[in-house]
Design a protein with these regions (language model features):
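P-loop NTPase signaling cores
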Residues: 1-166
């Protein structure tokens, strides 16, 4: 049984369906949050502080096969299997809250723990200002055969913000 926080549909805040985006060489692609569940590559979700990354990850963790933890919990856990439990996909929040000595340390520490778990699928969140794209993506590429995908959380528009606050 995982010891990480496991919200249910009843404990997760009702929130507005979010949109994420990523760039290809040709264009910018928008992705509704439900489509995250269909993706199989390593996912890195980026957004500004307070944009709802943690709420989005809590929502993901309500689905069968997903288990949520923070990056710090994963790094300091002696036996990371207790965080994954029976899940197949680890949802890792708040990479930006891990203090590292140099660029890439936090990503390397997370990947080391994922290695102890046999490199399961994962979703990782980080503040965009703290994510070192080239360093982080290269480190993930070295351990995973699928190309990682950076997804940016789209900010609320005025109508969404009003609906969220009501």
């Amino acid at each position: 049984m995982p010891t990480s926080f496991q919200p249910t549909a009843q404990t997760v805040h009702e929130f507005i369906e979010r949109t994420l985006w990523f760039e290809t060489e040709e264009s910018r692609i928008e992705l509704p949050q439900r489509d995250i569940l269909k993706r199989t590559e390593p996912l890195v979700i980026l957004g500004e502080a307070g944009m709802g990354k943690s709420h989005l990850l809590e929502w993901l963790a309500t689905f069968p096969g997903y288990s949520r933890c923070t990056a710090n919990q994963l790094i300091i856990r002696h036996d990371p299997k207790t965080l994954l439990g029976d899940a197949k996909i680890l949802v890792i929040d708040a990479l930006d809250e891990v203090s590292g000595r140099k660029e890439g340390d936090a990503v390397d520490e997370v990947l080391k723990k994922l290695g102890e778990l046999g490199y399961p699928r994962f979703v990782l969140s980080c503040r965009v200002a703290d994510w070192r794209s080239a360093t982080g993506l290269e480190a993930i590429r070295e351990q995973y055969s699928d190309e990682p995908l950076e997804l940016h959380l789209t900010p609320f528009d005025d109508d969404d913000a009003t609906a969220f606050l009501v």
